[in-house]
Amino acid sequence: MVQESRPGSVRSYSVGYQARSRSSSQRRHSLTRQRSSQRLIRTISIESDVSNITDDDDLRAVNEGVAGVQLDVSETANKGPRRASATDVTDSLGSTSSEYIEIPFVKETLDASLPSDYLKQDILNLIQSLKISKWYNNKKIQPVAQDMNLVKISGAMTNAIFKVEYPKLPSLLLRIYGPNIDNIIDREYELQILARLSLKNIGPSLYGCFVNGRFEQFLENSKTLTKDDIRNWKNSQRIARRMKELHVGVPLLSSERKNGSACWQKINQWLRTIEKVDQWVGDPKNIENSLLCENWSKFMDIVDRYHKWLISQEQGIEQVNKNLIFCHNDAQYGNLLFTAPVMNTPSLYTAPSSTSLTSQSSSLFPSSSNVIVDDIINPPKQEQSQDSKLVVIDFEYAGANPAAYDLANHLSEWMYDYNNAKAPHQCHADRYPDKEQVLNFLYSYVSHLRGGAKEPIDEEVQRLYKSIIQWRPTVQLFWSLWAILQSGKLEKKEASTAITREEIGPNGKKYIIKTEPESPEEDFVENDDEPEAGVSIDTFDYMAYGRDKIAVFWGDLIGLGIITEEECKNFSSFKFLDTSYL
């Protein structure tokens, strides 16, 4: 607790330290201080699958093939990540890694629950320590915290994300990792993915990292897509083409293909994590309320039954691994941006006109739809040339998966309105795309970058349509388990050891500070300069979100004939989508 001492008023703030962090359990030593942390360089190898932090006198790690951190002694590193030569790094087995990037790093943390003036000063200190270009050592502009503007960006459910603004300086995107993520996101793997994407000029530039977050390029004048934008007939085609480009444009590592689908790796990991919390798993009320099942044992049995069924539909695990590609795995509309206005695109979804001519090509569309398939698979050059204006961001969940999983995830996001002020967690099953909308999306996806494919396009679309329905329950299961972990309900309460002290704030006022551990509910207290609308990591109802997700999971399993209604106790709570194949 912070009490601001000034005549006639006392202001209190909640100030805490993370009881658990990825590096160690430690208290925040103080509030804001004018300090400059040692700037290190994190070297991320593309092929070695490792990235460790080393001391500045341990530079031999690079020569031994460990992607490590070096003391920054070069002025050439001031502009953020740089690409290094192929001969500089070798992996632990002695083979040469082909490429790697170097990213500035400081061993500091940011506490998003700090009062605004403290948080701004800490952010500015980090920017200076990381030597972010234009902000650091600028002879014309010397940034001061009180002139900085923080805008919290809505729609983020894993992190606290801010736009950092300053007059006449390029804005930055600040990402502060959320609580309860230790078992959710592998940050080392995420950085390796960002390195791979950077080498292919995909995604925003990464300017620097700290212990619990990072700074990225802010895409100025960009517009985040909305729930209505993704339903737009032409936008949906464009999203499909861009997803296809990502799927074929980023090769998998051999280790990724060997490890199998990333979604089931995570699902199995999260099931083990939840199962270890005996008190939670052992209470049937938790399982019934959160997973809509009688008990944990029955839930695990049905998940195993579905997984075995899914693998059999794919002709075995070897075939599943063979078909893996690089996937984003979280292509919800909040992660899709237009970097510039797209010409001649309606703002809302409009079905094809009934006066349209019938396509001369074969088609899986109902004859009554009057859709011209040729217009989908052969878009005008002017239309396709604007695809580059659509970019996908936030690769936290990216990894190897079947295309059907990634596409099913995107189509499932049509059911959500994260900017709904009352219930951003709610799943609206009636908003799942209908057959025409799915076919519009799939014809665009399959026809783009098709190369010399021998399979007739209708057959490929039909096969993918079926596979999406079969992988759709995996999507719902994944995010349901994610929600349970993200909610913090499994976290054990730790004893509070409060520390009280006095400090002088950046504005010269005297503060009495009581520092104590944070509970999940206390993390990331709102303190930005501008009001926030829509979903927020602070207020999002993760458990209700997960319950709606698992309701779709059960509905799909019944529709696919994997389980029966008689096996289910909470049948009335289930949500049902169309599970019929073409």
Curated annotation (Swiss-Prot):
Coiled coil: none annotated. GO terms for biological process: phosphatidylcholine biosynthetic process; phosphatidylethanolamine biosynthetic process. Residues 1-36 are annotated as: Disordered. The modification Phosphothreonine is found at T54. CDD domains: ETNK_euk. Optimum pH is 9.5-12. It comes from the Eukaryota. It is found in: Cytoplasm. InterPro entries: Choline_kin_N, Kinase-like_dom_sf. Optimum temperature is 30 degrees Celsius. The modification Phosphoserine is found at S30, S48, S51, S85. The keyword Amino-acid biosynthesis does not apply. It holds the Pfam family Choline_kin_N. Its main location: cytoplasm. Keywords: ATP-binding, Cytoplasm, Kinase, Lipid biosynthesis, Lipid metabolism, Nucleotide-binding, Phospholipid biosynthesis, Phospholipid metabolism, Phosphoprotein, Transferase. One of its GO terms (molecular function) is ethanolamine kinase activity. It catalyses: choline + ATP = phosphocholine + ADP + H(+); ethanolamine + ATP = phosphoethanolamine + ADP + H(+). Belongs to the choline/ethanolamine kinase family. PANTHER family: CHOLINE/ETHANOALAMINE KINASE, RE24176P. Catalyzes the committed step in the synthesis of phosphatidylcholine by the CDP-choline pathway. Also exhibits ethanolamine kinase activity but it is a poor substrate at 14% efficiency compared with choline. This is Choline kinase. It comes from Saccharomyces cerevisiae (strain ATCC 204508 / S288c). The gene is CKI1.
